[in-house]
A protein has these predicted regions:
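N-terminal Rossmann-like NAD(P)+-binding subdomain of aldehyde/semialdehyde dehydrogenases
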Residues: 1-142, 179, 192-193, 205-210, ...
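Hydrophobic/aromatic ligand-binding patch that stacks against planar heteroaromatic rings
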Residues: 178-179, 228, 418, 448
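ALDH superfamily catalytic-core signature
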Residues: 186, 203-210, 214, 224-226, ...
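PLP-dependent aminotransferase-like
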Residues: 159, 171-223
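Short gly/pro/ser/thr-enriched loop/turn and capping motifs at secondary-structure boundaries
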Residues: 195-197, 244-247, 279-282, 464-468
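Conserved C-terminal structural/oligomerization subdomain of aldehyde/semialdehyde dehydrogenase
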Residues: 2, 17-34, 153-156, 161, ...
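Active-site proximal loops enriched in glycine and acidic residues that flank catalytic Cys/His/Asp
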Residues: 164, 191-193, 219, 238-241, ...
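Active-site-adjacent "gating/activation" loops or surface patches in catalytic cores
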Residues: 125-170, 174
Length: 566
């Protein structure tokens, strides 16, 4: 536990570090990031073991794959993306020189974030991601502004506090690197107490930045966080967590806090950015699916809810289906089975059991699924009613099914309206659609994507893929304010350091290989390693991480061999 004296000392160190960082050239900034990248690779095993310890996972569980894929793997990819951007800036060119730029709906530009290079094409074949810029941003201005704070490295922006997340272990490191390189701040990283087990390994991987007094890592409870964010030496705060925690920081708690929020009079006297989750939808467009399609996509949706035990800010919580879809019941039966049969794991996140009980108390008719009955599936929800599931992020294995009485294009339009208007938050939305359905909708399908007000939209993929894509942006849809924060303000990741970002759009294959190839969809990716029922996820995740630490052609066959057995 950190006391106020230690905090004062850490902030004094960072104050000195900021002055030195302002004089540090781009080449040296890149070199220190390369050392961090190397250290993440060297300590990846320790990183995963620490994560497994506080999540109470057995060392031989396939679920360890989640810790590789959401821990050192994206941290390595994020550092590598920033290194590439720094190299471009050093050379006097734009980070997006040579990157594919295309038109997107509504007068927008789309910057290709995935694939970025031949290895992406091979390892995530069939997946793509684009960063859509805000309407009116042209290619010339996008190129000029890419690089953000590293375009004027001497103009540092003070000390930033990063309040780390308690669920995914790459979030705090990635947010820290983003604040340093995008925003040109030095950083006091305060860990969520749930993740205190990560303190030793984080100190090791950040050692090059700690030695320069650019980073300090602190632990402690809410009292430490409160003292830290309100400290006069701190110029900015970034939090990953809940809107409730955000509002407590900005306005205080209790009736006084609520009154300050209503009056738009924050207690926090400095800017704050945030990533806060919400109620994420999965819109299932009706079509003619095979039995294998129904089973695979049911496992896909179950993964969107149950990955990391259900403790993800972008976990799906509301599945939206057409009540008149002939295959609705078959899909829901497959979804029940997928949720019920997913591997058992401990409920490590505080308050999870209480949140599951709260959902069940509202809907005692709901199904209790899983080996211990700890997962709740609530069917038959109706749009337009006062339904807690649509307004409350449960952050637990709770999934609702909303039925809309429409078909075809009308269903698609109404589902987008429902997601935009009735669900809390704007972090991520998923769409599942047969390729023939997408083709039949034509240009109107792109209009559906444009109309969804979400920071990441995934078509036949989980929005979590956007989180894993280092060059993609990650954050809420733009426009929220501190008194109506919803899923947050600002963004992170964004490996090209783009300005004027609106959203990321991810696309994936409707079917895994080899079935995708046999049915005419050229995508070579088998069942993804982030699926909760993937039997070789731990091996694949470890091999992908080792590859990302030190890429090489000779490492690819072993990755493919493991992935194909999943």
């Amino acid at each position: 536990v950190t006391d106020t004296t230690e905090i004062d000392s850490a902030l004094a160190d960072l104050g000195r570090g900021e002055k030195l960082w302002a004089d540090t050239p781009l080449s040296a900034r890149r070199e220190v990031l390369e050392r961090v990248h190397t250290l993440i690779g060297e300590h990846a095993e320790e990183w995963v073991a620490a994560a497994a310890s506080f999540k109470k996972l057995s060392p031989d569980s396939p679920l360890i794959g989640e810790e590789w894929m959401s821990g050192p793997y994206p941290a390595l990819a994020g550092a590598a993306a920033l290194i590439g951007t720094m190299r471009k800036l050093e050379a006097g060119t734009s980070p997006i020189d040579g990157v594919r730029i295309t038109d997107a709906p509504g007068g927008r530009l789309a910057i290709q974030a995935l694939p970025h290079g031949i290895f992406d094409t091979l390892l995530l074949n069939g997946f793509s991601a684009q960063v859509w810029l805000q309407p009116g941003v042209d290619a010339a201005s996008a190129r000029r502004s890419a690089g953000l704070g590293q375009r004027t490295p001497a103009a540092t922006q003070g000390i930033g506090v990063v309040l780390g997340a308690g669920n995914i272990t790459s979030i705090a490191p990635l947010d820290t690197l983003y604040d340093i390189y995008a925003n040109n701040r030095v950083v006091a990283l305060k860990l969520n107490p749930i993740t205190d087990a990560m303190f030793p390994v984080f100190n090791k991987v950040f050692a090059p930045l700690i030695d320069l007094d650019v980073v300090r890592i602190l632990t402690g409870g809410a009292d430490v966080g409160t003292y830290l964010v309100n400290h006069d030496a701190v110029s900015h705060v970034h939090i990953t967590g809940s809107a409730i925690t955000h509002d407590a920081i900005v306005f205080g708690t209790g009736e006084l806090g609520e009154q300050r929020k209503a009056d738009r009079k924050p207690l926090l006297g400095k800017p704050i950015s945030s990533e806060l989750g919400g109620v994420s939808p999965t819109i299932v467009l009706p079509g003619k699916w095979s039995k294998a399609d129904l089973k695979f996509q049911a496992k896909h949706v179950a993964t969107q809810r149950l990955h990391n035990g259900g403790y993800n800010c972008v976990a799906s919580q509301a599945v939206v289906v057409s009540s008149s879809w002939p295959q609705k019941e078959a899909f829901l039966e497959a979804l029940r089975d997928a949720i019920d049969q997913a591997p058992e794991r401990p409920a490590y996140y505080p308050g999870s059991d209480g949140r599951v009980k709260a959902a069940y108390d509202v809907h005692p008719e709901a199904e209790r699924l899983g080996p211990s009955g700890g997962r709740v599936l609530i069917e038959g929800l109706i749009a337009g009613r006062d339904e807690p599931l649509l307004r409350t992020e449960y952050f637990a294995p709770v999934l609702g099914v909303v039925e809309l009485p429409y078909e075809g294009q009308e269903f698609a339009d109404k589902a987008v309206d429902f997601a935009n208007d009735e669900l809390a938050g704007t972090l991520g939305a998923n769409i599942v659609a047969h390729p023939a359905t997408i083709k039949s909708l034509g240009d109107s399908f792109d209009t559906l994507i444009e109309r969804l007000r979400y920071g990441t939209i995934a078509v036949n993929a989980w929005t979590g893929v956007g989180f894993l894509t280092a060059h993609a942006s990650w954050g809420a849809f733009p426009g929220h304010t501190v008194d109506d924060v919803q899923s947050g303000i600002g963004l992170v990741h964004n490996g090209f350091l783009l300005d004027g970002v609106e959203r990321t759009v991810v696309r994936g294959p409707f079917r895994p290989a080899p079935r995708s190839i046999l049915t005419g969809q050229f995508a070579l990716t088998p069942k993804p390693p982030w699926f909760v029922d993937n039997r070789t996820a731990a091996t694949t995740g470890r091999r992908l991480t080792n590859f990302t630490a030190s890429p090489g052609w000779s490492k690819l066959p072993a990755i493919f061999a493991s992935a194909l057995r999943g």
